């Protein structure tokens, strides 16, 4: 579960390396889980890229460390907390996504992110 001040790894090629969550979007929500949109500030960035350090961006949570229990009695857990930076229209800013992402993104209408990913778990 992602709360305020949690740092997440950015797994696309938009230019950010790490973001810190400053707000979970929704009505009075404390935690974000897979497929939730957060607002974050870029803490580390690659030089000469569109996303700069200290930019305020929207991102979708695509991996969390907490165990996810699915309805088919499987449970999935990732090694890190990761996000993909998106624009105001909901499409990713990067053109590539590195590493696996969760299947729950398709259910939450982020099929563009799921189709760009190397692996959907």
Curated annotation (Swiss-Prot):
Its biological purpose: Binds to 23S rRNA.
Organism: Cyanidium caldarium (Red alga)
The keyword Magnesium is annotated on this UniProt entry: no
Keywords: Chloroplast, Plastid, Ribonucleoprotein, Ribosomal protein, RNA-binding, rRNA-binding
GO biological process, one term: translation
Quaternary structure, from the entry: Part of the 50S ribosomal subunit.
A Pfam family matched in the record: Ribosomal_L14
Top-level taxon of origin: Eukaryota
Family: Belongs to the universal ribosomal protein uL14 family.
Localization terms from the record: Plastid, Chloroplast
Protein's recorded name: Large ribosomal subunit protein uL14c
